[in-house]
Design a protein with these regions (language model features):
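Hydrophobic faces of well-ordered beta-strands that scaffold small-molecule active sites
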Residues: 37-43, 70-72, 105-109, 154-156, ...
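N-terminal Sec-pathway targeting helices
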Residues: 1-14
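Hydrophobic alpha-helical membrane-insertion segments, chiefly the h-region
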Residues: 14-23
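Active-site cleft segment of glycoside hydrolase catalytic domains centered on the general acid/base Glu
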Residues: 53, 88-90, 117-219, 225-233
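Aromatic-lined substrate-binding rim segments of carbohydrate-active enzymes
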Residues: 56-64, 71-119, 170-195
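Extracellular/periplasmic catalytic domains that process cell-envelope and extracellular macromolecules
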Residues: 33-35, 63-64, 100, 146-149, ...
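Short strand-loop junctions, especially beta-strand C-caps/beta-turns
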Residues: 44-46, 75-79, 159, 227-229
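Boundary/entry segment of secreted carbohydrate-active catalytic domains
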Residues: 24-68, 73
Length: 233
């Protein structure tokens, strides 16, 4: 009797499998991915080696994987090669990709980039921290923010730890410069967050925490980048 029961069960399973095999294939719905503004992609000013299709694919893949932000680096000599004459071509393309993929934008318009300042456009020469540079900085960043509606944060100083490690005497000058630029931009764009960036690995490896403390109360935020392998120089 027991043998017949098992045979019957086996036949029922076989029939069920056969019926399932005859049913049309129903595609499994793709899982919904929620974009996270804290997860971003980094895009430097495009070189000629990068095609528009490659950029489109990179942005699309990033957004479908959950990225909700683009950290966009713009260099002053590229965006304003002539005074008051802006080169929007590349930036318009990148910003359209951000809009199409629902990405917020953090603008890296760094007056300081690690151990160097600038690069500035040739027409500016090499200005020091002061009123003239403050006015030009506010004017150019204002033009960029006003052109696009998706920039919600701006970084003015990048890897300050590296710069001040070489130019310790410039800390006070830059702090005054940053505060004046911050105040002017906040009057024009009160919802924009403005801050500075430090290299976490450099701060920890070289005991430069005091520079972070100098800027902890300035601006809206302090952000850290991290490269786990220390560079030789």
């Amino acid at each position: 009797v027991e043998k017949k029961i098992f045979v019957a069960i086996g036949a029922a399973i076989a029939i069920a499998v056969a019926i399932l095999g005859l049913l049309p294939n129903t595609p499994t719905p793709a899982p919904q991915v929620t974009q996270n503004e804290k997860l971003g992609i980094i895009v430097n000013t495009p070189s000629r080696a990068v095609t528009l299709e490659q950029l489109k694919d990179a942005y699309a893949e990033a957004s479908t994987r959950g990225a909700g932000r683009n950290n966009l680096y713009l260099f002053w000599d590229h965006i304003e090669p002539q005074q008051d004459q802006y080169n929007w071509r590349d930036t318009d393309i990148l910003m359209s990709l951000n809009k199409n993929n629902n990405l917020k934008v953090t603008l890296y318009f760094s007056i300081i980039n690690g151990r160097i300042v600038g690069p500035y456009p040739e027409w500016m020469g090499l200005p020091g921290f002061g009123t003239s540079l403050e006015q030009k900085t506010v004017k150019t960043i204002d033009a960029i923010i006003s052109r696009y509606g998706i920039i919600d944060s701006v970084i003015i100083g990048g890897q300050l730890d590296s710069y001040f490690d070489d130019e310790e005497g410039s800390v006070g000058l830059y702090k005054e410069f940053f505060q004046n630029v911050y105040t002017e931009l906040k009057q024009k764009h009160p919802d924009i967050k403005i801050g500075n960036a430090f290299s976490l690995n450099n701060v920890l490896n070289k005991n430069l925490e005091h520079y972070v403390m100098e800027f902890s109360e300035l601006g809206d935020f302090v952000v850290f980048t991290y490269l786990p392998v220390d560079r030789i120089n």
